[in-house]
UniProtKB/Swiss-Prot annotation:
Name this polypeptide is given: Heptahelical transmembrane protein 2
Pfam families: HlyIII (PF03006)
UniProt tissue specificity: Highly expressed in roots and at lower levels in stems and flowers.
Residue ranges annotated as Extracellular topological domain: 92-161, 220-224, 278-283, 348-358
Organism (species): Arabidopsis thaliana (Mouse-ear cress)
Any one biological process term the GO annotation gives: response to hormone
Gene name of this polypeptide: HHP2
Length: 358
């Protein structure tokens, strides 16, 4: 009996179907310790337990609904993806008034109609909300403003730059969630998904520039083209750089963070230019404050990502919840939301001055 079993196992090995360690781990479907992991799954030595290792695709997918050290990494960005998906759906509706007040009205139940023609259907002027929006508009002043500007070209305030940003944010967040979910399946999946994750981050950074630059520089075609082309080229270079398998290694964590921050902070140049051009417009000034908040949020998240605080201070204590990557994810979502507010404010500004009559 023992001899027959040995012959059977030998046949499986010759056919390439041996019971290697990976197959045993997949069949066991248990959470492992850091020291038990294959080298390609060893990323953070301060997280000691609750690792998934080479589970089947089905089991890996279903693990999104169980507790392990990647659960909150998956769901923090999956929830962010849901938020931006909702924003995309709302923005794609023909009757939606894009702009900050338009989104506030959707959340508060208020009805908002703007004092100028826009992408939405409304042309009357009133704010109606007894609960959250107490803001009176002077109808006479509004009509005189419209008369002084003449007919407004609806094409001057397109939706597509805003939708580009939402697409980039959604792409980044879903790629991140899928990477944290499936990267443990195999070495091949690990390499593919982490490279996809880094490409998604680069995509969101590039797409984030489109709405504010397009609307802020709508009357300055050369500068608009220059800034959008520059950040797009920089983003493509970053993506091609990060596609290198060696740069996906844990030891290049600081390099990746520095590259992403460099891309993000390159926005200081167009932001300064916008401030110079539109310093007398309150919406622009407030938008720049939100952009500053975005930069602080992203930089803070990157600091947690690189330093591995707080798990560095107490290894093993933050395996399930509270470790640095989860905190980093929260700051990324908050930073993207801050940028959303800034972009909507710039859109409000552009809609108020559609004819470039500054």
């Amino acid at each position: 009996m023992q001899k027959r079993r040995t012959v059977k196992e030998s046949t499986k090995i010759r056919n390439g179907k041996g019971m290697d360690s990976g197959e045993k781990k997949r069949s066991e479907k248990r959470l492992m310790k850091f020291e038990e992991l294959p080298r390609y799954l060893k990323d953070n030595e301060f997280i000691h337990n609750h690792y998934r290792c080479e589970w089947s695709i089905k089991e890996t997918f279903l693990s999104a609904f169980s507790w392990h050290n990647e659960t909150l990494n998956i769901w923090t960005h999956l929830c962010g993806f849901a938020i931006f998906t909702w924003m995309m759906v709302v923005s794609s509706m023909e009757t939606t008034e894009l702009g900050l007040a338009g989104f506030v009205s959707l959340l508060s139940g208020a009805t908002i109609r703007w004092p100028w023609p826009s992408m939405a259907m409304s042309k009357d002027v009133y704010f109606s909300s007894d609960q959250t929006l107490h803001h009176d508009l002077n109808v006479t002043h509004t009509r005189s403003l419209l008369n002084s500007q003449g007919d407004v070209n609806y094409e001057a305030i397109p939706k597509w730059p805003w939708l580009v940003f939402l697409t980039g944010a959604m792409g980044c967040l879903i790629c991140s969630s899928m990477s944290h979910l499936f990267a443990c399946h195999s070495r091949r999946f690990n390499l593919f998904f982490w490279r996809l994750d880094y490409a998604g981050i680069s995509l969101m950074i590039v797409c984030s520039f489109f709405a504010p630059i397009y609307y802020a520089f709508s009357c300055h075609t050369y500068w608009r083209l220059f800034y959008l082309s520059s950040i797009s080229i920089l983003g493509l270079l970053a993506i091609f750089t990060l596609l290198s398998p060696s740069l996906s290694a844990p030891r290049f964590r600081s390099f990746r963070a520095a590259l992403f921050l460099t891309m993000g902070f390159s926005g200081v140049i167009p932001a300064t230019h916008v401030l110079y051009l539109h310093k007398d417009h309150p919406n622009v000034l407030i938008a720049l404050v939100y952009e500053l908040a975005m930069a602080v949020l992203y930089a803070t998240g990157a600091a947690f990502y690189v330093t591995r605080i707080p798990e560095r201070w107490k290894p093993g204590a933050f395996d399930i919840a509270g470790h640095s990557h989860q905190i980093f994810h929260v700051f990324v979502v908050l930073g993207a939301l801050a940028h959303s507010v800034a972009s909507l404010l710039i859109m409000d500004f552009r809609r108020a001055s559609p004819s470039c009559a500054f």
